[in-house]
Amino acid sequence: MADGGGGEEGSASALRGSARRRGAVQPAGLDADELLTLMHGSDPVKVELNRLENEVRDKDRELGDAHAEIKALRLSERAREKAVEELTAEYEKLDEKLKLTESLLESKNLELKKTNDEKKAAMAAQFAAEATLRRVHAAQKDDDMPPIEAILAPLEAELKLARQEIAKLQDDNRALDRLTKQKEAALLEAERTVEIALAKAAMVDDMQNKNQELMKQIEICQEENKILDRLHRQKVAEVEKLSQTVRELEEAVLAGGAAANAVRDYQRKVQEMNEERKILDRELARAKVTANRVAVVVANEWKDANDKVMPVKQWLEERRFLQGEMQQLRDKLAIAERTARSEAQLKEKYQLRLKVLEDGLRGPPSGSSRPTEGKSIGNGPSRRLSLGGADNMSKISPNGMLARRSPSFNSRSSLSTSSSLVIKHAKGTSRSFDGGTRSLDRGKVLGNGPHLLNRSTDAVRDCETTDDWKAANTEEKGSEATNSSSTDTVSGVLYDMLQKEVISLRKACHEKDQSLKDKDDAIEMLAKKVDTLTKAMEVEAKKMRREVAAMEKEVAAMRLDKDQENKAKRPGNFKGPGTTSQAPHGRNAPRGGLTRNLQ
């Protein structure tokens, strides 16, 4: 009992401690809980904790019921012990009465034997008298014999006396028969009482055995309750660890998103710095050309018209430079033709898409219409954040923040505006130095997703600024390359460096996306582990229930077997006084064992 009380107090204190811990953890993870409830409505951790608390409460109730049953069984056992003591006293009294009746029966049997012997002697005397009478009748013929009356008178007197004694003996026999019948009835009643006492003693033995079995079952239940408490504490600790890891992973995901945003900001800054660098390089080249021209003019001012001759080295350099520019212009013409064709095709595609979008916008104006996501939304970097089994598709906005899926009207309007800007500035891009590659890249961007259209518009603006600068540069040069407005003075080394930086930035972005995907996979694995843990806990609970049901079935089968054995043993307990004298010793032994168990 003391152990049971200590176990209950320990379980109650463990429950209070877990409740305090949950109360301490709950304010810190309030946003996460709200996010979980928004995502999939319920928290599996809370559901599991509530289920375990309900199981602990059920076990506590079962323990209280078992203690109440133990108290009731103890009271009933005390009453049965008192009844057994009373029955043993009555049994001893009946044994004494039986011994007295047996002694009386023996004395009466001796008297009956004596009366039977006397009866036999009287019958023999009667037969002898009859023989003498026959002799007398046979001897009447003789004259010498005395008279018959003289002979018969004493014989008749003896006969009367013998008849009187016989009558007395018959009366005594009748009285003895009555006494024997009364004694037999008393013996039957005593046997019935003895049988009832033995049956009650057997019932008391059965109840004592059942009480011992119940005590053992209560101990087993207490041990199981302790084991369940330990398992409950372990599961609570595991759930807390898993929740902590989930929070850490969420923080890591948020940090990864912030890092991705920072990387995008750095990419933009690098692009802006590269543009500024291009502009500065072009201004420097322009300044060098003007300085060379000024130097040539200053050198030729003091000479005559016939002596104004350019040095051969400078002439060769300018000729080489002009030939290179002519070759570049030819290449640019070929690239411009290709880009014009591709842009014409893109223009047709975008016109078709604009028509489709306009038709969609002219449709039902209500917000309940199904969002039409065009085919341009392809393999964009939309990640799936799976937390607790919920899939949330998110798009990366141009400022790098994670945003939810916008409504259909906003997506259509953004697509239409971005595509109109692209079509508006399609011809301007063909005048740039790397216009073909940029147009192709822009086509890839438009194929990869609608969230990259802002970048394409930024590229168009960059091309426009470069075209304006090129026009100004050609006016200052005054060379034959003024006919085409697509010249570019950016050196090839700088362009290669910029291309390498762009490739490295793309690799960094790819690595960041890969790390984010790995983190998403880790979150999915953790969610799967939580699901497997919940399934394992359910399987363990089912196993425990099955084991309890099997134990109950075994106990019921054992009870039935013991009842059958007791029923089979009961007829063998009534063989004689020897067995009855041995019965109290058998009853005293289990009672002593029960008292030892109770102590």
Swiss-Prot record:
It holds the Pfam family MAP70. Keywords: Coiled coil, Cytoplasm, Cytoskeleton, Microtubule. Residues 1-30, 357-453, 557-599 are annotated as: Disordered. Residues 43-349, 533-570 form a coiled coil. GO terms for cellular component: cytoplasm; microtubule. GO terms for biological process: cytoskeleton organization. Residues 404-420 have a biased composition (Low complexity). Residues 557-568 have a biased composition (Basic and acidic residues). Residues 227-460 are annotated as: Required for targeting to microtubules. It is found in: Cytoplasm, Cytoskeleton. One of its GO terms (molecular function) is microtubule binding. InterPro entries: MAP70. Plant-specific protein that interact with microtubules. Belongs to the MAP70 family. PANTHER family: MICROTUBULE-ASSOCIATED PROTEIN 70-2. This is Microtubule-associated protein 70-2.
